[in-house]
Amino acid sequence: MHLTQLLMINQSRLIKVVAGVLSLLCVVGCDFAKMKKCPSYVATYIDIQGLKLETTSDKMSVEVNPSQGFSNEYDFLAEDSKFAYKYENLCRKHNDLSYNQKISVINGYDFTAQTFISEDFDSIKVTSDKDYDEKHPAGESLNDLCRFVAFSPYKFISSGYKDYYNYSKDNVSKTLAKLAGYLGISEGQKLTCHPIDKMLSDVTAKDLILLGYDNPYPLFRLYFESKPVVSGEHQITVEVRTDEGKIYTATITMNFVAGN
């Protein structure tokens, strides 16, 4: 079991703070803390029940998270053979088999390990219930208006755990830089998670593997790079298709101010 399930929250900063404190306790020699070798970078996978959308402070971005709560988790500590088998299959799917780093385990819980959802996405579509502009009538894709920003360790894993990313705000969009700041990433930090920073219309299925910055809160953000022609409320729907054909949809009300 992972810390995310214990807290049932989506605040990645809090998770990292708690994990850091617990790691410190392990270092000073708590009897109940043990270090166990995990063969894979991803130590825990979770099944999600749906998606939840939230607007950010700029009122032009949508943050996409798993809906509160999840059903099953699969990790390297799994005692149930069915869950252990699912975890091993997911690790093989991502060719994540030889990381072999030690993880802090306290009373059977891995508190500092990387957690991702058990499904990869295949495509994402954004629509509105109203006309956005003359080229984007109600119900038509807004993908070419939305910047997609996220992080993923898939490139690091695929490189044999060698390809790190040195973060610099000068090399990413302002939207990605805001997400990095929210996640507590500092300038020059060496990351195992690489950024995905492109227009949603240019995003491929390969960009949607193992989304998250070592946990799935948030999965990604979408920023509208242009404003609608008329001010008012729009019901914005995000539809996500998984690589197994499952579809998740979520809708949020956004109050736009028309552009010039």
Located regions from the model:
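C-terminal motif of bacterial Sec signal peptides marking the signal peptidase cleavage site
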Residues: 26-29
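N-terminal secretory signal peptides that target proteins for export/translocation
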Residues: 1-12
